[in-house]
A protein has these predicted regions:
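Structural/interface elements that position substrates and couple domains in central-metabolism enzymes
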Residues: 1-403
Length: 403
């Protein structure tokens, strides 16, 4: 491999597709990940995550010599940080991975380089990293281009949306913004909207917080309708006939490493000003707990009626349909709670998008449907649609797949 132009720190659900996209444009990309299995898998031209078209893109980029993975960074002209930003105690954001990745680049930076953070981050993170860099490398002050550019892609359609979605790009100064725009223009067909780093950071958080609030309204409706004896799916369909109403669909909660996480970045920093955002998080978290209660009640009623414990099928573990991503998944939380509460019961856990799991013993769809007394739909995977159910099977549909 020739000297790389791009170093991509983090080869997960966003970093690897981004690296593959850039490499597909005949640009040498050096990907970095702390997981040696990930590194070895990629260098074999294979992928460790499920994402349509990604396997072909990676295989081709590796074969052509434009993509290589490693455990350590090397010198380049552009560095992109796409690492996790998890929580500390009390839902406080943890930017230690971003800081560690940045520290790993300190001795590689040179004047004129471009440093970009794509990781979802609290407001002010880019400025903190700039201060860190200049404190350790004062001779580079005002000689690096530093920017924040959040991804805004949908799992399951990442390879398309990376290219075609608009992006918000915010530099620590105008020169950094323009440098970052010039970089992304080579690979992205969507409109690139310039701003400053703080606004770009908040923009990503607000986008996902807005979705969380809207989903919370739908989930709250589902709780109300359950108590009122109303079909929430029919209600929402009818309400959406109004030309200025567009209610989202309820589910068993909210998951993923964006919508279920990003609101806390705002609530943590602005607790007094983010009442609606905080309340939405509470509602969506409660919906998962409510689903557990409904399942446990259905199992109890079955046992009272039939004098035996039911066999229960839990359909879906991913945080959204047709992907293998279980991060922050309410379905996974519900399945774990059901198993923890179980005593001498049979459960069929079905997740067609993963081969195995270190906690759950997985079952195929057909076996679960044929043997279960109670079927719980948590995720609307395509594989679950048009399933023929027995008339005497008890069905709990928390994702609207039967509507």
């Amino acid at each position: 491999m020739n000297n790389p132009e791009i170093v991509m720190i983090g080869l997960g659900y966003i970093g690897l597709p981004t690296a593959a996209l850039i490499a597909s444009n005949s640009v040498y990309v050096h990907g970095v990940d702390i997981n040696q299995n990930v590194v070895e898998t990629i260098n074999q031209g294979k992928v460790h995550i499920v994402e349509p078209e990604l396997d072909y893109a990676v295989a081709n980029a590796v074969k052509e010599g434009y993509l290589k993975a490693s455990g350590t960074p090397v010198e380049a002209s552009t560095y992109i940080i796409v690492v996790p930003t998890p929580f500390k105690a009390k839902n406080e954001p943890d930017i230690s991975y971003v800081e560690a990745a940045t520290r790993g680049l300190l001795q590689l930076f040179k004047a004129g380089d471009l440093y970009i953070i794509e990781s979802t981050s609290p407001v002010g993170t880019t400025e903190k990293m700039m201060s860190l860099i200049y404190r350790e490398r004062p001779e580079l002050k005002d000689k690096l281009h530093i920017a924040y550019c959040p991804e805004r892609v949908l799992p399951g359609n990442v390879m398309y949306e990376l290219v075609h979605n608009d992006r918000v790009i915010g530099g620590v100064n105008e020169a950094s913004t323009q440098k970052a725009i010039a970089f992304y223009q080579k690979y992205i067909k969507g409109i690139l909207h310039p701003t400053n780093a703080r606004t770009a950071e908040m923009c990503k958080l607000v986008e996902n917080s807005s979705r969380d609030v809207q989903i919370a309204f739908a989930n709250e409706l589902s709780l109300i309708c359950d108590k009122a004896g109303i079909d929430v799916w029919e209600l929402i369909t009818l309400a959406n006939k109004h030309p200025r109403v567009q209610i989202l669909q309820p589910g068993c909660g909210v998951g993923g490493h964006c919508i279920a996480v990003d609101p806390y970045f705002i609530v943590s920093d602005f607790p007094m000003e983010s009442k609606i955002i905080g309340a939405a998080r509470e509602i969506n978290n409660y919906k998962s707990f409510w689903c557990v209660e409904k399942i446990e009640n259905a199992k109890l009623q079955f046992e009272i009626l039939h004098k035996r414990k039911p066999k229960t099928a839990i359909m879906g573990l991913a945080f959204k349909p047709n992907i293998d991503d279980l991060r922050e998944s309410p379905a996974k939380y519900i399945a774990q709670k059901i198993l923890q509460n179980a005593q001498n019961e049979v459960h069929f856990i079905v997740e067609p998008n993963i081969k195995s799991h270190n906690f759950f013993k997985l079952t195929d769809t057909q076996t679960a449907i044929e043997q279960a007394d109670i079927i719980v739909f948590l995720v609307a995977h395509d594989e679950f649609k048009n399933i023929q159910l027995s008339d005497d099977t008890i069905v709990l549909d928390f994702c609207g797949i039967l509507k």
